[in-house]
């Protein structure tokens, strides 16, 4: 009796193909690197800066210098893990309407000797179908 090699070869090829996939694509909810220039990352970063300034008790606004690293995770929506550098500006927080991101980015920086730079780690949860973003974690030093 002759046995065909076809039934064994097909599953073996499938297994080999799966092993060659990047690990993040194999694990549902795995964290993957993202480009810092990705529009969704940029939007999450803008939101993080806006929220940082709203929650901070500092008398001056901080603006985004750069996104150092970005990662994302597919959850019920997307969670963005951002490492960013922020710099204290000369724009004082005053009573009334708070500044929006684009206004903050236009704020002048103090002279070099007086500059305060922070490295911050943010987690932003985005649910676009609800038009909602939430800052779930924030730490700066």
Curated annotation (Swiss-Prot):
Expressed by the venom gland at an extremely low level (at protein level). Negative results: the recombinant protein does not inhibit calpain-1 (CAPN1), a C2 family cysteine protease and legumain (LGMN), a C13 family cysteine protease. Does not provoke cell death (PC3 prostate cancer cells). This is Cystatin. The keyword Nucleotide-binding does not apply. It comes from Oxyuranus microlepidotus (Inland taipan). GO terms for molecular function: cysteine-type endopeptidase inhibitor activity. SMART domains: CY. The keyword Ribosomal protein does not apply. It is found in: Secreted. The lineage of its organism: Eukaryota, Metazoa, Chordata, Craniata, Vertebrata. GO terms for cellular component: extracellular exosome. A motif (Secondary area of contact) lies at residues 73-77. PROSITE patterns: CYSTATIN.
């Amino acid at each position: 009796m002759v046995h065909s090699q076809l039934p064994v070869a097909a599953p073996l090829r499938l297994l080999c193909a799966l092993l060659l996939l990047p690990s993040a694509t194999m694990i549902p909810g795995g964290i993957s690197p993202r480009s810092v220039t990705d529009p969704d990352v940029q939007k999450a970063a803008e939101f993080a800066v806006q929220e940082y300034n709203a929650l901070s008790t500092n008398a001056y606004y901080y603006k985004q210098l750069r996104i150092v690293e970005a990662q994302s995770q597919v959850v019920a929506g997307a969670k963005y893990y951002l490492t960013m550098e922020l710099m204290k500006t000369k724009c004082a927080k005053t009573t009334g309407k708070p500044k929006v991101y684009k206004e903050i980015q236009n704020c002048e920086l103090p002279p070099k000797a007086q500059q305060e730079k922070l490295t911050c780690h943010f987690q932003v949860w985005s649910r676009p179908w609800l038009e909602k973003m939430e800052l779930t974690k924030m730490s700066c030093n």
